[in-house]
Amino acid sequence: MGFNEFLSSIFGNKSTRDMKEIQPWVDKIKAAYPEVAKLDNDGLRAKTEELKEYIRNSASKERAKADELRAGIENVELEDREEVFAQIDKIEKEILEIYEKALDEVLPVAFSIVKESAKRFSENEEIVVTATDFDRTLAATKDFVRIEGDKAIWQNHWNAGGNDTVWNMVHYDVQLFGGVVLHKGKIAEMATGEGKTLVATLPVFLNALTGNGVHVVTVNDYLAKRDSEWMGPLYMFHGLSVDCIDRHQPNSDARRQAYLADITFGTNNEFGFDYLRDNMAISPKDLVQRQHNYAIVDEVDSVLIDDARTPLIISGPVPKGEDQLFDQLRPLVERLVEAQKVLATKYLSEAKKLINSDDKKEVEEGFLALFRSHKALPKNKALIKFLSEQGIKAGMLKTEEVYMEQNNKRMHEATDPLYFVIDEKLNSVDLTDKGVDLITGNSEDPTLFVLPDIAAQLSELENEHGLSDEQKLEKKDALLTNYAIKSERVHTINQLLKAYTMFEKDDEYVVIDGQVKIVDEQTGRIMEGRRYSDGLHQAIEAKEGVKVEAATQTFATITLQNYFRMYHKLSGMTGTAETEAGELWDIYKLDVVVIPTNRPIARKDMNDRVYKTKREKYKAVIEEIEQLVQAGRPVLVGTTSVEISEMLSKMLTMRKIEHNVLNAKLHQKEADIVAKAGLSGTVTIATNMAGRGTDIKLSPEVKAAGGLAIIGTERHESRRVDRQLRGRAGRQGDPGSSVFFVSLEDDLMRLFSSDRIASVMDKLGFQEGEMIEHKMISNSIERAQKKVEENNFGIRKRLLEYDDVMNKQRTVVYTKRRHALMGERIGMDIVNMIWDRCAAAIENNADYEECKLDLLQTLAMEAPFTEEEFRNEKKDKLADKTFDVAIANFKRKTERLAQIANPVIKQVYENQGHMYENILIPITDGKRMYNISCNLKAAYESESKEVVKSFEKSILLHVIDESWKENLRELDELKHSVQNASYEQKDPLLIYKLESVTLFDNMVNKINNQTVSILMRGQIPVAEPTEEQQEAARRVEVRQAAPEQRQDMSKYREQKQDLNDPNQQAAAQQDTREAVKREPIRAEKTVGRNDPCPCGSGKKYKNCHGRNS
């Protein structure tokens, strides 16, 4: 007995402990159910209203307190509002916690209501209830409800996903168990066919009672629409509104209404993009989402793990975005690749001759030639076949070890004769000197594709005597420009090389309608709108001869993980999460609970069948399919790429075996094909995991013949994906079988495992065509998968660590932006900006005259202290003094601005208010004129204070957006440039974190400076009017402002950037980042107004010693 087994025998395994924890809840539900079942139909619905009322009342005191604080905010001084808002935020958190306790209290009754409703719909064709206003509204648009007099008649059949569906489901005990797990914010792992969709109805119904909204997140729009239609009537019966965001256009009123529904269905991408769009909005009317309350993520492993390397990006055009070198440099790369192919073939034929020699030295030379051929083109089919022969791969690996000794000291001897070197495991391509010579050719500049040592050149320039500062600056600019041009050229060559040597059409991507579209390696589906990053996608477009898309700039970005982390409560469902439980806990603190099946699984999972070559393997697959079809069993064949699915299709057509193909090119009929995949003798070829969420139902004849047969044509890198394929068979206790066919030429085996298995096969004397099937082999393959999973987890975690840096910045910026947009907290933010600006002017200037100039430029004020005071007084006291004067000036100027605007506003509103909704007010800061749109009625009622608020809002939004966009670009450049730190034995992430803090500080300072400078100088341009002008003013037609503009999203592109590409995994080969001017790092830390006081009281500095200074 192992140590883990020993511990399990004492404490029980995790599954048992989870069951023990949840079982009392299930017992409570069962105890509450008989009372609920006694209620008539109206009583059942009334019970729901009773629960809603109970939950609302549970936090009524707290809500009243928060409302009272909000109502009195206008009477609080600007400087003190921050504390009031902090109190409001604290109460809002308390309300959420109170609601959670109330939900736990009503859970048994709420779950019983859902179960009883499901039972009544399954047992009755019609349910008659007293009609409510909600019923009458529904009856106008839904065909499953009709009104007769004062009665509403609900039918038990409706359209879901294009099919007429009769409700026939009632919750099992294990589904109640799953419902509790989801409500508790955990992941429920349930086997295929166990009714995950029905399980979700329990926690969705319960949490929707709060009125704060529940989001049900799915992986594709078909499932989102189908599930909202399928489960919707069960919720609507109890007066809960249901909608699906994927039915409506982004930024539309319909999309906003969908978010206001009690229950909102949608795809993960659309939820994420709506969040980004909301944070680019220019009016509160543009916002669609409300608070992130509770989300249930269907197929949670796919969203939180498979998509983990894929940030959502909204990008827009950049100046000169059409300029690119890909088409221009493509012929050079094609020449390079052709030359390498000739070289690789030559080395391979040399190796074949020399390895069979009796001379030991010649054998060594043969294995070196083989190693060179492998480094030249590792995917060469002839090479892969030769490596599968007895003893060949082991010999090549020994040769590799010789050259890898002492930190790759001799590796250049092996690779110098090549034009470029490919490392499959690192996903990298490196150009050699020989390759550079080939593409440079007869060029006048032999260093055309060689990056100069910019640091050394700049150092030489600094030490060069006899040059004026101006001449040095000119030379420096020329050096940096030359470096940037060469850097772009080298980068383009590298990306084109990757496109030609590491990315294959119909495997990693497909070309449809003149566009390169990425095929998701996990699902086999086309990832619409997703692009490889860093120019790789453009390189593939150039390779395929399609239009190379223009370069874009990121305007807003977030990873799905960081989006879903914003929810107050998050849970998920999947058939396979146990293998990734560690990652889900590490990153999201989500616990995986395995839900037992309702009936025992009867599927037979066989050991892997291993062959030496792919040819033998596919031949065996076809023979296996033929036998299963003859036995009358349906067969689902899982493949890892479009190319393999098309090849198997051709082989089956030659054998005259009828079949359906489901891959990235033929995905339109997915639901139909998968639904028919259970018919007797049906063969369905599908790329991995296609059809998730659609059950394959079997007829009695098929069950008698042995059920659905799953054939995997290759082991995937992830055990989870293999488990998902196996899980298609054996639903609800049905019979079935699964088996994987593997060859030593498969990518997983070739890269991670085949040397050990190959040596076993060599020792046992297996010949070509023979198959090995043994538990030891299956275990060895699983070990290889674990190795890859660990590597992929490392990559995902690393990328998340990079995004976490940006996420902290994004949270700060988007919070400030939302304050400006909504207007409620804008005054508080401006006060803090003025304080920061005052403190910075005192802190950053050692000279009195410089300090005076700084205050004049940014705060438009004279220094409120003498030179002597500046030298002798404490800095914090000077800052406080400056701040008091600045705030007084700011209040005086804003009051003056309102006074000047008010007569005009009053006149227009009283004479022409019925004609105009908004008015444009011209305001200038002395440098630029701003036309500020303001609501006429609000301006009139507030005596033009609304004009000031609109001015502040417009300026703050403009400055934040421009600064954040620039910061994103700099962070992007920084991320690439820090990779070079690994060559200096430094951690690039650490350097990134340190440098990004400096960038962020610079951005915040820039936002503060620009905002304060414009607001402090803002005034309505007026001149003393003549009598004629006064008379004309009385007759002037007022210029009407257009209705407040909606954000036009059409110029932006939404995309999912694929971070699972070589650029993100391998260290960047050159520093592409332009030199950025850095502020000196200051050792001493200044205490901000809102920082904790250094005295240790726990109060904010401004309320403690900051006030006493």
UniProtKB/Swiss-Prot annotation:
Residues the record lists as binding Zn(2+): 1093, 1095, 1104-1105
EC number: 7.4.2.8
Domain of life: Bacteria
Record: residues binding ATP: 175, 193-197, 695
Cofactor(s) it depends on: Zn(2+)
Top-tier EC class: translocase
Biased composition (Basic residues): 1099-1109
Keyword Zinc belongs to the record: yes
PROSITE patterns: SECA (PS01312), SECA_MOTOR_DEAD (PS51196)
Keyword terms of this UniProt record: ATP-binding, Cell inner membrane, Cell membrane, Cytoplasm, Membrane, Metal-binding, Nucleotide-binding, Protein transport, Translocase, Translocation, Transport, Zinc
Key word Cell membrane present: yes
BP GO annotations: intracellular protein transmembrane transport; protein import; protein targeting; protein transport by the Sec complex
Topology of this chain in the membrane: Peripheral membrane protein
Subcellular compartments: Cell inner membrane; Cytoplasm
Region Disordered, residue ranges: 1038-1109
Amino acid composition bias (Basic and acidic residues), ranges on this chain: 1045-1059, 1071-1088
Gene Ontology MF terms in the entry: ATP binding; metal ion binding; protein-exporting ATPase activity
Family: Belongs to the SecA family.
Function, in words: Part of the Sec protein translocase complex. Interacts with the SecYEG preprotein conducting channel. Has a central role in coupling the hydrolysis of ATP to the transfer of proteins into and across the cell membrane, serving as an ATP-driven molecular motor driving the stepwise translocation of polypeptide chains across the membrane.
Assembly and interaction partners: Monomer and homodimer. Part of the essential Sec protein translocation apparatus which comprises SecA, SecYEG and auxiliary proteins SecDF. Other proteins may also be involved.
NCBIfam families from the UniProt entry: PRK12901.1
Protein name per its UniProtKB record: Protein translocase subunit SecA
Organism: Bacteroides fragilis (strain YCH46)
Name of the gene encoding the protein in the UniProt record: secA
